[in-house]
A protein has these predicted regions:
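Short conserved catalytic/interaction loops centered on acidic-Pro-aromatic/His motifs
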Residues: 109-114, 130-145
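Hydrophobic alpha-helical segments of small multi-pass membrane proteins
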Residues: 115-127, 145-151, 158
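Acidic, Ser/Thr/Pro-rich regulatory low-complexity segments at or just upstream of the first helical elements
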Residues: 1-90, 101-108, 172-221
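Channel- or pocket-lining gating/hinge segments that regulate access to a cavity or pore
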Residues: 139-182, 187-188
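Beta-strand elements of modular eukaryotic interaction domains
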Residues: 83, 110-114, 150
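Short helix-interrupting loop/turn segments at helix-coil junctions
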Residues: 88-92, 127-135, 169
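Contiguous, well-ordered alpha-helical segments that form the cores/surfaces of helical PPI scaffolds
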Residues: 79-80, 93-101, 117-129
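Non-catalytic, well-ordered alpha-helical scaffold segments
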Residues: 29-33, 89, 93-96, 117-121, ...
Length: 221
């Protein structure tokens, strides 16, 4: 899915959320890029603060920490989830609501590079179950997210208990989070989103080049 021709505007974001069509739209929905930009900036801020101070960490929320940090940008990871699960744009808005509720319910939790991927696949899967009529099994989401099925099952259960099973999102809450994402685009957010997209594309190109180089190297050996 090409992202280089993606139109970045509040109107485009709103249009994607309410009328995105897999058949007619070749680009990734804008909400994914906006969410990736927001999360990456949050991670950068959290990791900068972490260097200067320490905050109490709950052992309960450490279940989202991975042993090794995945070598994949947030943008690329969200695009992968979108490509293989076909979860609609509204799912990502609801996932954003859930992440916010989770952080409010667990003040000691901070999104960082070690926990963000597991948190995202879990929240998107839970949001998909809430929003969509038809869903893939947990085992499929686990493969897409790079986890074991039992691992994702446990993360889902932990997530639900840690946020107090507060899954209901009414229309006014949904609209307020859509408006927040729109403001992210209109108030200088476009630059950050374009930067996020460029970084993701550069990493993809570099990896493709490395794969081609390795294939050539194997042939020459």
């Amino acid at each position: 899915m090409g992202s280089s021709s993606l139109v970045i505007s509040p109107r485009k974001l709103r249009s994607d959320v309410y009328s995105y069509s897999y058949e007619n739209d070749s680009n990734t929905p804008l909400v994914i890029s906006v969410l990736a930009s927001l999360i990456e900036r949050t991670m950068t801020r959290n990791e900068r603060i972490a260097k200067n101070c320490t905050w109490p960490l709950s052992n309960k929320t450490r279940v989202f920490d991975c042993h090794e940090i995945p070598d994949m940008t947030i943008q690329s990871y969200l695009e992968r989830i979108f490509r293989y699960t076909r979860a609609g744009p509204s799912v990502y808005v609801v996932a954003y609501v859930y992440i916010d509720r989770f952080c409010q319910a667990n003040p000691g939790f901070r999104i960082n590079s070690r926990n963000v991927h597991r948190l995202l696949i879990t929240t998107i899967m839970v949001a998909s179950k809430y929003v969509e009529d038809m869903n893939y099994r947990n085992s499929y989401f686990a493969r897409v997210g790079g986890l074991g099925t039992m691992e994702l099952n446990n993360l889902e259960l932990d997530f639900l208990f840690l946020m107090g099973f507060k899954l209901h999102v009414n229309v006014s809450v949904f609209e307020s989070y859509c408006c927040h994402l729109e403001r992210e685009v209109s108030i200088g957010g476009g630059y950050h989103i374009e930067k996020t997209l460029r970084c993701a594309e550069e990493i993809k190109s570099r990896r493709c080049g490395e794969r081609r180089f390795n294939q050539i190297a194997r042939i020459m050996m």
